Amino acid sequence: MALLNFRKKETPAPQAPVAEVEALLKDYSIEVMPRTAEKVEDFRALLPEGTRVYIAHIDGTPIEDMVATAARLNADGFKVMPHFPARIIKDRATLADWIARYQGEADVRQALLLAGGVTTPAGEFSDSMQLMETGLFDKAGFTRLHVAGHPEGNRDIDADGGRLNVDAALKWKNDFQTRTDAEMAIATQFAFDAQPIIEWADSLKAAGITLPIHIGIAGPAKLQTLIKFAIACGVGPSLKVLQKRAMDVTKLLLPYEPTDVISDLAAHKAAHPDFNITHVHLFPLGGIKTSATWVQENGGASGVPADAA
């Protein structure tokens, strides 16, 4: 199998200065699920004050569990941003009920709107644009709405591996900025290689899409764990980064860390201050504590936990 075709290790690329990495990681966000959040004894010992915490809503997760997780994080002083996956929401009444629960029990004012991973919609919604068009988020006074981005495409949307449909959807969402009082941004799927990310971000800017980008980055994890998630999530060309790592026998059993991709993006951001990637969003595939600790060790002041500040 090509993945295990060992070769001599390449010379490591130079790392960006600590200050540049710290700047890119400032106000980073992280993603949890109710079951992963349960394993964390104290979020304030791990995350900086006011960190935005996304709560992924996997099909089958009771809304009660989602709201309870949101309430805990809100009480700890974090900005809570639950997922609203269109295809698992039955109808407008269900959406209104979820919003009311989140706001009544957890003071939620932010949301990530996305189609969701299921193939067949549970009801009347099939994409995030339909959720936005209900007007319910503005009616409830949401201050921030994020939408999904895919630096390497999404075959659930463009079966040919292209970007025609996914880019058209982003243009629609970009135009929606003028119809909502909420601040908007793109939160992306994770990728492992900076160059395709930079090219994608530049292409959006060239197409007139002005939404700021919160780039998805996989936190430290075992190589086999990352490969499993990358394939399941449709991560494309940047899988080569993992393949290259697997060719180095000395690294096979060591956890992957996002040092290189963060360093490359930080250097690009420092050289191009108007770069439209404004924040990092961490997917803690190797564990919440592992990802938070990595930021503490590599992000300078941007990683200082709330209880240590």
Regions found by a protein language model. Give the residues of each.
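Glycine- and other small-residue-rich loops at beta-strand/loop junctions that grip anionic moieties
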Residues: V32, I58, R87, G162, ...
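Active-site pocket-lining/capping segments in soluble small-molecule metabolic enzymes
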Residues: V32-P34, L114, D127-G153, R163, ...
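Conserved, mostly hydrophobic/aromatic
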Residues: P82, K173, A182, I215, ...
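Hydrophobic, aromatic-enriched interface-forming segments
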Residues: G161-R179, E183-K205
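Substrate-binding cleft of secreted/luminal carbohydrate-active enzymes
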Residues: A270-I288
